[in-house]
Amino acid sequence: MKIRFAILAGLLVVGLLSGLPVQAQQAAGHVERQKGPASRSTAAVTIDLAEGGRIFVGDEIRTGPGARLQIRFDDESMLTLGENALITIDQFVYAPSGDSSQALAIAQGVFRFAAGQIGKLAPDNVALETPVAVVGIRGTVFLGGELTVGMPAGQPHYGF
């Protein structure tokens, strides 16, 4: 009798909890290309990234030593991060026929950003915050961070 009561009580609790609303993460984009270690963190969970992996609003993205990461957002904007970069996806809302906005906080590292549809449709609604400035979109492509370029003989190449 006690076992039957415990089982019924457990099933009741599971049934009640299953009715609670679960907040889904809002997708923002995916990993287009990756070289080296990179991860995304949300609250207390850290997940290693891989090509094709989804990126969500609220994610903190971190690249490791020697790493490069390219993120394609759902509006076709592209963010390329160099090694030891740290950014947060603060906001991403893409509605081709409505209000759209994108906000990224770049805490450290080298980055390159090419605006997508949000930058074309609502350039005032795209912002990238760095430790020393907030960048608003007036053009479409810019590079930030510290970068040293050498030009040895041969064909120059920066990227993957």
Stretches found by the model and what they are:
Residues 8-18:
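Bacterial N-terminal signal peptides
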Residues 17-25:
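Bacterial Sec-dependent signal peptides at the C-terminal "C-region" and cleavage site
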Residues 1-5:
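Positively charged n-region of N-terminal signal peptides that target proteins for export
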Residues 24-160:
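Flexible, surface-exposed loop/linker segments and immediately adjacent secondary-structure boundaries
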